[in-house]
C-alpha cells in the first residue's frame, strides 16, 4: 500500500487506508469514517467543521482507491435529498455533464453519468452506467459499474451524524482501461472528489436556506 505524498493543510493530511474489500460494506464505510475521526482527534486540536480529509491508495494494475470526507453542520436529511436527486446532479456537480435515471426497482436504481474534463487544450469524456443501492436507514448509497469506460468503478456515499456535526464520506475504487493515462486520472480524481463534496454541501445548504 502506498500513500500519496501531497501537501495538505491541517485536517486534510493523508491517513493510511486499511486494506478492505471493495465495494465497502456499510460496516466498513462506517469504520473508514471512524478512522478519519480518530486521526483528527490525534491532532493537537480536533478538526473544525467545514474541513476536508482525504486519502488515496495505489493498488496493482493501475487501480486507485480514494476516500474523501467533509465535516459540516447540516441536517443529514438535506444531504440525502441532494444525493438521491439523480436527474439533477449534473446541475451542480462540476464536470458532470449528464446524470440520467434509467430505471428503479425498489431501493435499487440504474443511473447513466457522463463526465468531461479539459486537459492541455483537449476535452476528454467518460461514461458509466451505475447500479446504486439505497440504504436510507444507514444513510448510505453504494454503487457499482455495470458498463462504461473503466474496468472498475465502484464505491459508496456515507452520511454520518453525531454531537460534533455531520459528515459526508465518499469512497471510490477506480481502474482505468488499457491505454488510459493513470497518472492523469489520479491527479484529476484527487482534485475533483473534494470539489464534488463541496458541491453537494453547497446545494444542500441552498435548499435548506430556501425553506
Please provide the spans of the model-predicted regions.
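Hydrophobic ligand-binding cavity/cleft-lining segments
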Residues: 2-107
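Beta-strand/loop substructures that line and gate deep hydrophobic ligand-binding cavities in soluble
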Residues: 3-6, 144-191, 195
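Glycine-rich portal/gate segments that line the openings of hydrophobic small-molecule binding cavities
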Residues: 56-62, 90, 100-147, 199-211
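Hydrophobic/aromatic beta-strand elements that line small-molecule binding cavities or substrate pockets
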Residues: 67-70, 99-100, 126-134, 154-161
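Solvent-exposed residues in well-ordered beta-strands and their adjoining turns
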Residues: 71-75, 114-118, 133-135, 146, ...
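Short amphipathic alpha-helical segments
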Residues: 75-81, 124, 185-192, 196
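Hydrophobic pocket/interface hotspot
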Residues: 79-82, 89, 132, 168-170, ...
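Short acidic, gly/pro-rich beta-turn/loop elements at beta-sheet edges
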Residues: 80, 111, 121-123, 153, ...
Amino acid at each position: 500500500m502506498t500513500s500519496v505524498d501531497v501537501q495538505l493543510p491541517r485536517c486534510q493530511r493523508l491517513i493510511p487506508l486499511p486494506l478492505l474489500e471493495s465495494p465497502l460494506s456499510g460496516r466498513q464505510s462506517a469504520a473508514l469514517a471512524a478512522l478519519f475521526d480518530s486521526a483528527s482527534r490525534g491532532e493537537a486540536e480536533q478538526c473544525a467543521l467545514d474541513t476536508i480529509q482525504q486519502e488515496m491508495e495505489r493498488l496493482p494494475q493501475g487501480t486507485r482507491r480514494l476516500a474523501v470526507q467533509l465535516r459540516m453542520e447540516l441536517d443529514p436529511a438535506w444531504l440525502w435529498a441532494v444525493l438521491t436527486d439523480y436527474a439533477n446532479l449534473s446541475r451542480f456537480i462540476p464536470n458532470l455533464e449528464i446524470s440520467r435515471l434509467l430505471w428503479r426497482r425498489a431501493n435499487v436504481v440504474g443511473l447513466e453519468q457522463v463526465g468531461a474534463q479539459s486537459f492541455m487544450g483537449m476535452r476528454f469524456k467518460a461514461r458509466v452506467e451505475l447500479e446504486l443501492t439505497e440504504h436510507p436507514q444507514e444513510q448510505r448509497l453504494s454503487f457499482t459499474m455495470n458498463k462504461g469506460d473503466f474496468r472498475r468503478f465502484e464505491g459508496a456515499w456515507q452520511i454520518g451524524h453525531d454531537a460534533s456535526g455531520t459528515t459526508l464520506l465518499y469512497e471510490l475504487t477506480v481502474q482505468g482501461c488499457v491505454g488510459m493515462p493513470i497518472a492523469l486520472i489520479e491527479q484529476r480524481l484527487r482534485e475533483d472528489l473534494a470539489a464534488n463534496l463541496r458541491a453537494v454541501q453547497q446545494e444542500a445548504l441552498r435548499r435548506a436556506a430556501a425553506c
